[in-house]
Structure formats: C-alpha cells, structure tokens
Amino acid sequence: MREYKLVVLGSGGVGKSALTVQFVQGIFVEKYDPTIEDSYRKQVEVDAQQCMLEILDTAGTEQFTAMRDLYMKNGQGFALVYSITAQSTFNDLQDLREQILRVKDTDDVPMILVGNKCDLEDERVVGKEQGQNLARQWNNCAFLESSAKSKINVNEIFYDLVRQINRKTPVPGKARKKSSCQLL
C-alpha cells in the first residue's frame, strides 16, 4: 500500500486541525486549542487504490517556524489553508508557498489552496474570486472552499492531493511494458 505524507499549513485559527480531525475521525472540534504539531494516519481508497495517508497538522503560530523546513522537506503534498473570514490569513500564504518551493527546490509541488469556514458566508471578507485568482497565479494550483463544521469539501482536499502526487510520481509497477515471448 502506498503511503502519502500530507502537510496542512496556514495561520493560527484558520481551521487546520478542524479539517484534519473531521477528515480522519469524522467529528467537528468546536474549541480552539492551538496545535504545536499533530500527526494522523488514515487508510482511504482513492480511484480504486488503497492509500495510507500520514497527515501532519502543523502549528499556525509564528513561534514554531523552526520546525517548518523539516516537514516541508518530508511532505509530499501540501494543503495551504486560510479562513474566508480573515484577510490576513489569506495574505500569509504567499510566504508559506514560497518557503515550500524553496525547500523543495522545484515549482512542481502537489498543493491545494483551501478557503476554510465557507459556512460563515455572512462573515466573509475574502471573496471566492480572490482564492481562484491566487490559485491561477500559483501555476493553476488546485483550489477549494471548505467547511469542517458543515463537512463541505473536507475529503476532497486530501483526495485531490493524493491524485496530484499520483500524477507527479505514478505508482511503480502500475504501467508495465507489454512484452512478448517469441519461440524460434
């Protein structure tokens, strides 16, 4: 079974843990409890293939930035999360993306931009078009709006990253050459 190392990044309070826990355990965490770093494992089926996802839920606060390079180096796919209710969380993602590309030393990194808390439409300050435009600027990066509370697009975030990783590095042995045996 293929393993995938996924990393969830973004500012504090955007709902990184809520999205991760909703995906892994199927529950919504109401209380905000800042994360230092949590790791989750979940077996899922994506496109008829069994996958083991290792999801790293990271700290949003600035005090743990020293750990970032390490999990950026080890991660294969990245969910960059902002809250649609806080412009600053959207603005913070450009630096995070640049750091990922620098650590990975490539522009081709499986990544998805996630506008979380889309259930709070009346508190929205970051328009959907802003997210779509940023994703376009980022080499047509995948983009979704989600809600951990309302279970909107939660699974899709992680499944999309798995598909991107599969496209970038296909499963070994899946595309076998056709060979023939000729008897003389």
Swiss-Prot record:
Record-linked CDD domains: Rap1
Keywords: ADP-ribosylation, Cell junction, Cell membrane, Cytoplasm, Disease variant, GTP-binding, Hydrolase, Lipoprotein, Membrane, Methylation, Nucleotide-binding, Phosphoprotein, Prenylation
SMART domains: RAB, RAN, RAS, RHO
Catalytic activity: GTP + H2O = GDP + phosphate + H(+)
Domain of life of the source: Eukaryota
Any one Gene Ontology cellular component term annotated for this protein: glutamatergic synapse
S-geranylgeranyl cysteine lipid modification positions: C181
Ranges where the record places region Interaction with KRIT1: 25-67
Consequence when changing Y32A: 25-fold reduction in RAP1GAP-stimulated GTPase activity
Effect of Q63E: Abolishes complex formation with RAP1GAP. Loss GTPase activity
SUPFAM superfamilies reported in the protein's UniProt record: P-loop containing nucleoside triphosphate hydrolases
Activity regulation summary: Activated by binding to the GTPase-activating protein RAP1GAP. Activated by guanine nucleotide-exchange factor (GEF) EPAC2 in a cAMP-dependent manner.
Family statement: Belongs to the small GTPase superfamily. Ras family.
Listed name of the protein: Ras-related protein Rap-1b
Taxonomic path: Eukaryota, Metazoa, Chordata, Craniata, Vertebrata
Gene coding for it: RAP1B
